[in-house]
Amino acid sequence: MQLSSSEPCVVILTEKEVEVSVNNHATFTLPKNYLAAFACNNNVIELSTLNHVLITHINRNIINDYLLFLNKNLTCVKPWSRLATPVIACHSRTPEVFRLAANHSKQQPSRPCEAELTRALLFTVLSNFLEQSRFIALLMYILRSSVRDSVCRIIQSDIQHYWNLRIVASSLCLSPSLLKKKLKNENTSYSQIVTECRMRYAVQMLLMDNKNITQVAQLCGYSSTSYFISVFKAFYGLTPLNYLAKQRQKVMW
């Protein structure tokens, strides 16, 4: 029976032994109480039965948030091979949590607290695979959609790092000139993406962590506070302090 989903990733839990085939490749067996994470996009996933399988559907936002939550340097992750079968399996440590996650992943949350509960449950499901060496590479493979998104994920993995075009291009197995060309085709540029990532992070730090401007500048990878302020003003139309005052005023109203 074919496993399908509208989301880019599904994770299954086997309640009995299940035979699996992906893209008509050789069949393999998942024992009872095993988890398997599949990349769904453009892949044909066949299971011997769906009667003894629980399924969670995981969207792009959850995967992206999970990678940020892990706070790993993604430049060190070897890209997933396009020839490899897009699945990773492991023994389930928390089957009861998975059952809750499977139920919640099929529902549309009506309240913010329900959305946060679903997010936490899915993070727990994904964390079962952390000991699998290629798991992060599979998640990055699942998220591939645009070069811009790939660059964003690398920069967001360590905002403070001194990024340059060569380092980012190398981590994507591209030459700097080819990366520039691909980004131009997506109507953006490397410098624009770096600025956007840093400015979004700057706002988070200002609003949530109660840090001063110099601290925020350093956390965003700027050695010069005055330069950080000028970039912030060009991006948001306000200085960091004025932006913060405006946001606090909104809360008061």
Swiss-Prot record:
One record GO biological process: response to temperature stimulus
SMART domains in alphabetical order: HTH_ARAC
Protein name, entry field: Porin thermoregulatory protein EnvY
InterPro entries recorded: Homeodomain-like_sf, HTH_AraC, HTH_AraC-typ_CS, Tscrpt_reg_AraC-type_HTH
Domain HTH araC/xylS-type: 149-246
Top-level taxon in the UniProt lineage: Bacteria
Binding region for DNA: 166-187, 213-236
GO cellular component: membrane
A Gene Ontology molecular function term of the record: sequence-specific DNA binding
Cited function: Influences the temperature-dependent expression of several E.coli envelope proteins, most notably the porins OmpF and OmpC and the lambda receptor, LamB.
